Amino acid sequence: PGTNEIFGIHHMDFSLLKECRIFHLGYPPLLPRLIADDGHELEMLLSSVKGEGVITSLDLSLPDSEGNAGLANWPRILKRVLPSVDIFLPSIEEIVFMFRKSEYENWNGNILPNVTGNYLRKLASEILELGVAVTGFKLGVMGFYLQTTKDPQRLQVLESVIDIERWCDVNLWHPAFSVQVQGTTGAGDSAYGGFLTELLHGSSPHEALRIACAVGACNVEQSDAVSGILHRSETQARVEAGWATSSLKLPE
């Protein structure tokens, strides 16, 4: 078996956390040991990291509907682990598959034409109620949606990097930037990375969301996963120069 197959909490060197500001974990659906027993090890891992005072961030991948990950009880897993997650920004396809499986199936996996601003707000509110501080959904050609907790106390864990007052009770959508798409591999990861980078630089929610969209857009201009990504200052300059956004609008 590969490393994904066997990776578990015992592989973690928790002494490294003293050097971390954000602990980011990707792809529980590809880490079968972590999601076994309704996410027992995943919960242990994230709660242990959070117990060290480190900001926790979680990203997903779309499970294989016919594999073990696709058959997992994702509502139960997420309800178990999300209280230990500070930042949670999955794609809309991933979260609908896991949290609203019947809708995913009714829509045949074609999620974007069926979502509205109201749908996203309700779904994000459900996630925030599970204990997450900052959540949102990567929307591909429709951009990025962001929503944060109304509880300033929940944001205290982020106070070393953000202005809590500016980040409390936020509800934002940013359209995608206009690009010639060459490939989408790594687009969501790039956008998430751009968001976390802006968070570490103390940016506002709007700026973090804007740059997240920009980094994702730069990524898709190349066919591979990384070569389109620019330095932060170059990305900012491109946005400030008036980079046009998509004409697609999010229905209310």
Tell me the role of every PLM-derived stretch.
Residues 1-177, 226, 230-252:
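Ribokinase/PfkB-type carbohydrate-kinase core domain
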Residues 96-97, 182-205, 209:
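Short, small-residue alpha-helix embedded
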Residues 99, 199-200, 219-220, 239:
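Hydrophobic residues in alpha-helical segments
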Residues 142, 193, 218:
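Glycine-centered loop/turn positions within well-structured domains
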Residues 218-227:
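Short arginine-rich
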